[in-house]
Amino acid sequence: ALEYQYVMKNPKQLSFEKFSRRLSAKAFSVKKLLTNDDLSNDIHRGYLLLQGKSLDGLLETMIQEVKEIFESRLLKLTDWNTARVFDFCSSLVFEITFTTIYGKILAANKKQIISELRDDFLKFDDHFPYLVSDIPIQLLRNAEFMQKKIIKCLTPEKVAQMQRRSEIVQERQEMLKKYYGHEEFEIGAHHLGLLWASLANTIPAMFWAMYYLLQHPEAMEVLRDEIDSFLQSTGQKKGPGISVHFTREQLDSLVCLESAILEVLRLCSYSSIIREVQEDMDFSSESRSYRLRKGDFVAVFPPMIHNDPEVFDAPKDFRFDRFVEDGKKKTTFFKGGKKLKSYIIPFGLGTSKCPGRYFAINEMKLLVIILLTYFDLEVIDTKPIGLNHSRMFLGIQHPDSDISFRYKAKSWRS
């Protein structure tokens, strides 16, 4: 379980780059990356716009989008409404993420456009495990159709019509024009890759966050208390409209909320860290030695740590406060008597670490805060939900079925 440290120490001999480029070519029809190092480097530089001050700007936009979506629709629902958790999460996460990153659609039928794009995206995502397999795309007719349909919605001409596009999308548009000129479809393929990366794991992760919180009312209560204490300490009042505001630092200060999100990711993330061997080599770890040939793949599987009872007591259980100790973030976990440097690894490591991880976690935190602050939530189905392992090694697992819950906006008259 600790051998990922040895894999990370050999970045030149064990490379993520070629594997990543082939995956982009197959899944998103991004072909030029296979042969163009400068393009790859420019794309990676663009990911800096998902950190620091640029991330603060994205969070501001996201808060505005959340406010508009909830106030125009969900906050008006003062009677109990029933919904399916996965449907509810996919609808919310898709619209908030899309409008935060790509901007607002100005067309009169924007609701219909967003709804259709979401349905198309979910169909495309259902095919994703097949797209990254060795099956030729020509045999995956539906997947290829959905891929092309979404790309045509994300061409530079279409994206330029969006209002309030994020910095990363604007910069990406300009940078891609440098390489592709007027090849609209090729640039749209890159946008599909960005859209998929921003949604494919956040949607199921948000499902699991809601699922576990609905199953554990005691966790909801503690998180509500933490959020209420924060709002009081910053002089913010809850009322009929969404007036609460958070900076990135303030979101990070909510230790119970962060712990609950990390615990969700620990339980449902089954991503792997994959590297391609660049030259014949001997690879030694603490426990054994291996002879690796050029072209072999090495995979490290973080769930071995996430589910190790020596690292996490009762690893199958959801414990929302697992990452809290004495009111602060708990960061000390041990294996074989040694303190682990990395004990929760849902986003990969090294060069393959997800550049949008802060964006995704902030989005989940914000949605949990709004749902717990402004709504009463109750589970209807109490049946346990399992993981659907069709995305093994590819990230957050989808549930094997959906469950119903009910919700209503809280009354503020009192």
From Swiss-Prot:
It comes from Rattus norvegicus (Rat). It catalyses: 25-hydroxycholesterol + reduced [NADPH--hemoprotein reductase] + O2 = 7alpha,25-dihydroxycholesterol + oxidized [NADPH--hemoprotein reductase] + H2O + H(+); (25R)-cholest-5-ene-3beta,26-diol + reduced [NADPH--hemoprotein reductase] + O2 = (25R)-cholest-5-en-3beta,7alpha,26-triol + oxidized [NADPH--hemoprotein reductase] + H2O + H(+). Its cofactor is heme. Its main location: endoplasmic reticulum. It is found in: Endoplasmic reticulum membrane; Microsome membrane. Its EC number is 1.14.14.29. Heme binds at C354. This is 25-hydroxycholesterol 7-alpha-hydroxylase. Belongs to the cytochrome P450 family. Pfam families: p450.
